[in-house]
From Swiss-Prot:
The gene is rimP. Pfam families: DUF150_C, RimP_N. The keyword Iron does not apply. HAMAP family: RimP. This is Ribosome maturation factor RimP.
Amino acid sequence: MKQEIIEKVKEMLQPLLEERGLKLVDIEYVTEGKPVLRIYIYNPEGTTIEDCEWISRRIGALLDIEDLIPVSYTLEVSSPGLERKLKNVEEYDIFKGRDIKIVLKEPVDKKNVIKGVLKGREDNNIIVEEEGEEVRIPLENIARANLEFKH
């Protein structure tokens, strides 16, 4: 049931996101206690409170019309955060061009941590530019990856 709701919300969000030039990062539907539907969106030019409000108003109205969640719930729409932990492969495409920190399972060039600019993904590799050099990291060698915020 939870996954069905998430999939239906994704479908409903797609035209709204495209209209506003936004990308969907993640959807969480938590049912412990009062249910919470969390939608994380990303604007490559910088996610604003206006982006979140715009999506919240529109998806909230659509959800009310569809009566997709038949109980009282809380809707939260937000940016993914400055130092978000990347949870799925698609996020490496979404956050291309952002600073990233990757903790490795096995060292690459004697390093356990790679920090640099995310260049994207190719096949089963993540490409990071670290100190002017391109580093290819196999997905299976990534223990953890987070966006990095540089002050």
